């Protein structure tokens, strides 16, 4: 079954997907979008569902617990996280899905990839994501 490895990975990370947060559904949709647009936008080195699940999605969200722990030690009200050279949105989009309490800024210089990122933001209803078209060197603060 497609998605079985993704579900098992989420369980290992103790990430619960339910009808309210729809984590699995959003990650599944994102993987399908990567597969659909990969050849046009060169987003990953594979279009295999399970490979994307393990090597890209689960790898991206493996940092979620550490990010939460780091955020607790900071005295800021709002935590902002930048994904510089976001490409196809990895690790930013998977992290934004599992950490909706944080703001994510996806910085990408290529127009077509920015268009892909904006599309994913809309499709996945990621209100905590901002796409910035820029080179990393030109980003201030």
Where are these predicted regions, by residue range?
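Class I SAM-dependent transferase core
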Residues: 1-76, 119-129
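Conserved SAM/SAH cofactor-binding pocket of Class I
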Residues: 61-141
